[in-house]
Regions:
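Carbohydrate-binding surface patches
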Residues: 1-4, 261
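An acidic-aromatic loop/edge-strand motif
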Residues: 4-101, 130-133, 151-240, 250, ...
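Regulatory/sensor and coupling segments of signal-transduction and defense proteins
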Residues: 92-105, 109-116
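Aromatic-lined ligand-binding clefts that engage carbohydrates, nucleic acids, or primary amines
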Residues: 112-143, 177, 241-269, 275, ...
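Short, surface-exposed loop/turn segments at beta-strand-coil junctions that are enriched for proline
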Residues: 116-118, 167-169, 287
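Solvent-exposed serine/threonine-rich low-complexity stretches and specific carbohydrate-binding patches
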Residues: 145-154, 270-277
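Short, surface-exposed beta-strand/beta-hairpin micro-motifs centered on an aromatic residue
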Residues: 279-282
Length: 330
């Protein structure tokens, strides 16, 4: 995603509050408090992801029920779709008989997503680990098979990652991914989340993920970034701010939502350092700024929680919050 036009944001999203602060050498320095509210230009340092942690499942291709991705036997405990010929009795004479699935069973999984009109991504891949699906399987997108030759090894968060270029298989509007798996043992099935991976933004509409153009301006002061709810990695935010002089100062970022990530602050392209924990303060040396407008860049590296679990830690309520649930409630 490209950057927005230079100076498009001005300094409307920043509020500078000067205060006296002592640095480590005991010298008094002017503290510049930078509000993270408002719109900043944003530039993700890697491709975005759309996470699928829930699918619909069926054993007959007709009756469907929503489940979390997990092993087949765990999904059986979550649903009521197994019965009749899918259940077998086993046990020796004189011992209690046990119910078990009558393997092999053909199981179908499907999930839908939309692509906003006129916003088909220039890069779009299906991404998953090699062990995400256990059991012989076939994957179709809009009724067209994702051929084995399309899969290539990639390294996103694990050496087992693989991705298939699916741009030719999708269309504007509604799309459907269907996975057929031959279940032969309890631990088979669609066991882990899988993803769309590419140059897009992610929205939510009527309980469905929607791929959009990547936002060029976002508000960093949020539990998760609009358009990038499942993004894990480094995100760069940039704006301009007016400084009164080129004197040394201490920079502090002001948040409505506390941030406890690894953060780097750059002024006019020069790094003031990286903070991975509180206090989040950066020493801006004399000469790094100039009187007037200066370019301020904030690089934030978050954890894999957004991508792997679809959650973030709510420090105000001290709990793990589900991103999709919160987005759908907005």
């Amino acid at each position: 995603m490209g950057r927005g036009p230079e100076g498009a944001l001005g300094n409307s999203c920043l509020s500078l509050v000067q205060a006296s602060m002592m640095d480590e050498g005991g010298r008094s320095r002017c503290a510049k408090h930078i509000s993270m509210a408002g719109k900043w230009k944003c530039l993700p340092q890697s491709l975005n992801v759309c996470r699928f942690g829930e699918t619909e499942v069926s054993v007959d291709g007709t009756n469907w029920e929503k489940v979390e991705v997990k092993t087949f036997i765990e999904q059986c405990a979550q649903t009521k779709r197994l019965g009749g010929e899918q259940i077998a009795m086993e046990g020796e004479f004189g011992t209690p008989r046990k119910l078990r699935p009558a393997y092999p069973i053909t199981c179908f999984y499907k999930v839908g997503f939309k692509i906003r009109k006129g916003e088909l991504p220039s890069e779009l891949f299906l991404l998953m680990d090699k062990e995400t699906i256990s059991g012989s399987n076939a994957i179709e997108i809009n009724g067209r098979v994702v051929e084995a030759s399309l899969w290539k090894p990639v390294r996103v968060n694990d050496f087992n990652n693989q991705a298939a270029d699916i741009r030719s298989l999708v269309r504007e509007g509604e799309n459907e991914i269907c996975i057929r798996v031959c279940i032969r043992k309890d631990e088979d099935g669609l066991r882990d989340p899988f993803y769309l991976w590419g140059s897009f933004g992610v929205g939510f509409e009527d309980g469905c993920h929607v791929l959009t153009a990547q936002p060029e301006q976002v508000c960093p002061d949020a539990p998760w970034i609009q358009g990038f709810p499942y993004y894990s990695g480094t995100m760069e935010f940039e704006t301009e701010i007016e400084f009164d002089s080129s004197e040394a100062c201490i920079l502090a970022l002001d948040w409505a939502y506390p941030s406890h990530e690894s953060i780097e602050v750059l002024v006019n392209g020069r790094s003031t350092g990286i903070c991975a924990y509180s206090p989040y303060l950066w020493e801006c040396e004399q000469g790094m700024t100039e009187k007037g407008m200066n370019r301020v860049t904030v690089r934030i590296s978050n954890t894999l929680a957004n991508m792997l679990d679809g959650t973030y830690f709510d420090y105000k309520e001290h709990r793990l919050a589900d991103i999709r649930q919160e987005a759908e409630e907005r």
